[in-house]
């Protein structure tokens, strides 16, 4: 408000970054017209498992830097040259302490925060049909029964936005302008 912002047309979050967006949605006083969550951000993993996975995830991300992106296909579903620089930079800048804190503060095995039904009607929780975290979709649907749950058929975690950033941006603009998903051939509703 102090900077003249009266409302937000859309909040967009991907993967485990969605924890921050969900916290924002539950705490902000600004009206939010739409939200779009892409991927398996709602995985609920016990604290002990998150602690055990941290060193392995750290080494996996660091290996992307050490190998100049050569290990990307072994870690993720793709090795697109267009996204390698982002993962290489992430691997270079990652510290174990920051990753440990982030993992312990996200993916928590606890109830989802409540959201007003009216806001739920304007939230899109997208999952790719081939991503590992597709199994969490039912839990999200139970927590937010008024939400929208498109499935990107044949897509993996965050694959559409990585492979077609322009198409992804156009889809978000369509949602913000028309309050519905565009007709895309790979969307299962």
Q: What do the PLM-derived regions correspond to, one by one?
A:
Residues 104-142:
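Conserved serine/cysteine hydrolase catalytic core
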Residues 144-158:
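Catalytic histidine neighborhood in serine/cysteine hydrolases
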Residues 180-189:
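Alpha/beta-hydrolase-fold serine-hydrolase catalytic core, especially in secreted/extracellular enzymes
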Residues 47-48, 64-117:
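Conserved alpha/beta-hydrolase catalytic His-Asp/Glu region
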Residues 155-167:
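Catalytic histidine-centered segment of alpha/beta-hydrolase-like enzymes
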Residues 22-62:
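Flexible "cap/lid" loop of the alpha/beta hydrolase fold
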Residues 12-21:
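Gly/Ala-rich beta-loop-alpha elbow adjacent to hydrolase catalytic centers
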Residues 1-9:
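Conserved acidic catalytic loop of the alpha/beta-hydrolase fold
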């Amino acid at each position: 408000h102090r900077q003249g912002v009266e409302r937000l047309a859309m909040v967009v979050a991907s993967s485990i970054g969605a924890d921050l967006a969900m916290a924002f949605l539950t705490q902000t006083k600004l009206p939010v017209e739409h939200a779009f969550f892409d991927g398996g951000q709602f995985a609920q993993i016990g604290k002990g498992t998150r602690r055990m996975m941290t060193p392995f995830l750290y080494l996996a991300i660091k290996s992307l830097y050490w190998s100049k992106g050569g290990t990307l296909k072994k870690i993720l579903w793709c090795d697109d040259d267009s996204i390698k620089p982002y993962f290489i930079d992430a691997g270079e800048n990652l510290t174990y302490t920051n990753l440990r804190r982030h993992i312990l503060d996200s993916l928590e095995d606890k109830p989802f925060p409540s959201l007003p039904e009216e806001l739920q009607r304007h939230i899109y929780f997208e999952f790719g049909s081939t991503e590992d975290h597709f199994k969490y979709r039912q839990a999200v649907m139970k927590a937010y029964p008024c939400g929208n749950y498109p499935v990107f058929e044949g897509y993996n975690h965050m694959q559409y936005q990585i492979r077609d950033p322009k198409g992804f941006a156009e889809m978000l603009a369509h949602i913000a302008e028309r309050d519905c998903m565009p007709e895309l051939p790979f969307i299962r509703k």
